[in-house]
Amino acid sequence: MFDIGFSELLLVLVIGLVVLGPERLPVAVRTVSGWIRTLRSLAATVQNELAQELKLQELQDSLKKVEQAGLQNLTPELKASMDELKEAAEALKRSYHVDAGSEAPHTIHNPLVTEPEAIHDGVTPAEPATQVSALAQAPNILEAGTASVADSVVEAAPVTTVKSVVQGEVLVKSTPVQEVGLADVMDKPVTKQQIDTIDSHGTDLSSAGPSRIHQPGGDQ
């Protein structure tokens, strides 16, 4: 490495022995030999790295040369097919950009739709005023339904009462009561048979009793 011959090395040892003495000379020799080993290892690593870099560079250059040679040796048919594929790809890219630009102005934006479910379904949520009006109309609907049910009950009740009254009147009218005028009684003498007939009619009326009128609230 340093191009040191045997004679030169022997001269260095003699000078070290004279200067350092026999006690320090072995220590100095070991120290110098360690430095030499370290320098040699560093030099070897640097040489290896440089060699690897050079090999990589040579490989890259050779690959580039092969690629260029392969492209030059391609047949005209392959070149034409490659050119057609490139043109088709460029045409598709241009058409996609044109479609995106034409659809952008016609897009309708709805800033009022903020709910995720409404955006997913495409339905605009109801306005607060509509919801308030619907809640305000709910009690009115319930009151109207209750009033209609009450009216139907009230209308059905008088029919039953009228029917009961009519039945009572029919019962009273159906009783065979003979009307006797006051003048006739005064003018004509009353026979025993007539008295018995009147007594029997009175007994029938008393046994029949007054007609009962049924009302929805209860019996009267």
Swiss-Prot record:
**One BP annotation, GO:** protein transport by the Tat complex
The gene designation is: tatB
Location comes to: Cell inner membrane
Q: What protein is this chain from?
A: Sec-independent protein translocase protein TatB
Q: Name one GO cellular component term.
A: TAT protein transport complex
Membrane topology listed for this record: Single-pass membrane protein
Q: Where are the transmembrane segments?
A: 1-21
Where is the organism placed in the taxonomic lineage, from the top? Bacteria, Pseudomonadati, Pseudomonadota, Gammaproteobacteria, Enterobacterales
The record's section on HAMAP family has: TatB
Instruction: For this UniProt record, give its keywords in alphabetical order, as a comma-separated list.
Output: Cell inner membrane, Cell membrane, Membrane, Protein transport, Translocation, Transmembrane, Transmembrane helix, Transport
Main localisation? membrane
| NCBIfam families for the chain | tatB
Q: What does this protein do?
A: Part of the twin-arginine translocation (Tat) system that transports large folded proteins containing a characteristic twin-arginine motif in their signal peptide across membranes. Together with TatC, TatB is part of a receptor directly interacting with Tat signal peptides. TatB may form an oligomeric binding site that transiently accommodates folded Tat precursor proteins before their translocation.
What organism is listed for this UniProt entry?
Answer: Yersinia pseudotuberculosis serotype I (strain IP32953)
The annotated region (Disordered) lies at 190-220
